[in-house]
Swiss-Prot record:
Gene (UniProt): cmoB
Record: residues binding carboxy-S-adenosyl-L-methionine: 88, 102, 107, 126, 176-177, 192, 196, 311
Reaction equation(s) it catalyzes: carboxy-S-adenosyl-L-methionine + 5-hydroxyuridine(34) in tRNA = 5-carboxymethoxyuridine(34) in tRNA + S-adenosyl-L-homocysteine + H(+)
Protein name, as recorded: tRNA U34 carboxymethyltransferase
Annotated source species: Pseudomonas putida (strain ATCC 700007 / DSM 6899 / JCM 31910 / BCRC 17059 / LMG 24140 / F1)
Enzyme class, first EC level, given as a word: transferase
Quaternary structure and partners: Homotetramer.
Length: 318
């Protein structure tokens, strides 16, 4: 059982206090329903060696270390491998380098300098395995709640969290839709790599706005195309082999959508073409990756002949 009482205590006296009261029952109900692989992943978590980190670095990456022998490291590696595939990272855990599919540290180095998270209550929507949650704490956030309904990501978060039990980061296996309307309790809300999977993009923006306090900041990172405010790509079928991609707006179009959704002070702080060095197959994620989804003769296009992945980060104020 995962005990959420520290989260409830943390949220006492905040606008999120009443929401927090029902979280334990909501989580227990989700765990009761479970997932077919949950027992196997729990076995991997139980196989992790009991270690106490003497070094913790969440500022320059995600690194935990202490004195431990090769046998303990081998045990650590085997247990973590049992939670593959690892998508977001990398993690350096007691001498084991988890070389994830994504170099998420590169994205954080592009996004992080534009943010002031000091003392902020943060929500990370579609948080994956929680890599960015730890980096947000490293950037001074007061606390970070992540929501993502993927059970493997939930277990990967637990693998790191069991070595950092005192830190104010929580991963809830919920979708954004599981959060109540008009929550209005977070200073900063992140939606990174989620927007293009949504069939109703404006509804997603409104739901994110609902989570923010008045004057709070949205950090929106998503796939975009080049063009003016009237340019939006809706793939006929797949995009980079993904079926569930709906809307790829231009940056000016996305900025307009944010303003229509009631946000102000909208600004784009980064646009980057995703490279095959930033997203690739590794020992920790052995399935196909970006190089398999691009035209082998022209990396400016996907295998479907559409513009290759280009990602933008926009900030906006409620």
């Amino acid at each position: 059982m995962i005990d959420l009482s520290p989260l409830v205590r943390r949220l006492a006296g905040t606008p999120l206090a009443s929401w927090s009261q029902g979280l334990q029952a909501q989580l227990d109900a989700k765990l009761e329903k479970g997932h077919g692989d949950l027992d196997r992943w729990r076995g991997a978590l139980e196989a992790l060696p009991a270690l106490q980190p003497s070094e913790v670095d969440l500022v320059n990456g995600l690194r935990l270390d202490c004195d431990c022998d090769d046998a303990t490291r081998a045990q650590m590696r085997q247990a973590l491998m049992g939670l593959s595939p690892w998508r977001k990272g990398p993690f350096d855990l007691f001498g084991v380098h988890v070389d994830t599919e994504w170099r998420s540290d590169w994205k954080w180095s592009r996004v992080g300098p534009h943010l002031d998270l000091k003392g902020k209550r943060v929500l990370d929507v579609g948080c994956g395995n929680g890599y960015y949650q730890w980096r947000m704490l490293g950037a001074g956030a007061d606390m970070v709640v992540g929501v993502d309904p993927n059970w493997l990501f939930f277990c990967q978060f637990q693998a790191v969290q069991q070595y950092l039990p005192e830190l104010p980061a929580w991963h809830l296996p919920f979708a954004l839709e599981d959060l109540p309307a008009n929550l209005e309790g977070f200073d900063t809300v992140f939606s990174m790599g989620v927007f293009y999977h949504r069939r109703s993009p404006i509804e997603h923006l409104l739901a994110l706005k609902d989570c923010l306090v008045k004057g709070g900041e949205l950090v929106l990172e998503t796939l975009v195309i080049e063009g003016d405010e009237n340019q939006v790509l809706v793939p006929e079928d797949r995009y980079a082999q993904m079926r569930n991609v709906w809307y790829l707006p231009s940056v000016p179009a996305l900025a307009r959508w944010l303003r229509r959704a009631g946000f102000s002070d909208v600004r784009c702080v980064d646009v980057s073409v995703t490279s095959v060095e930033e997203q690739r197959s590794t020992d920790w994620m052995r399935y196909q990756s970006l190089s398999d989804f691009l035209d082998p003769n022209d990396h400016s296009k996907t295998v479907e002949g559409l513009p290759a992945p280009r990602r933008a980060t926009l900030l906006a104020r409620k």
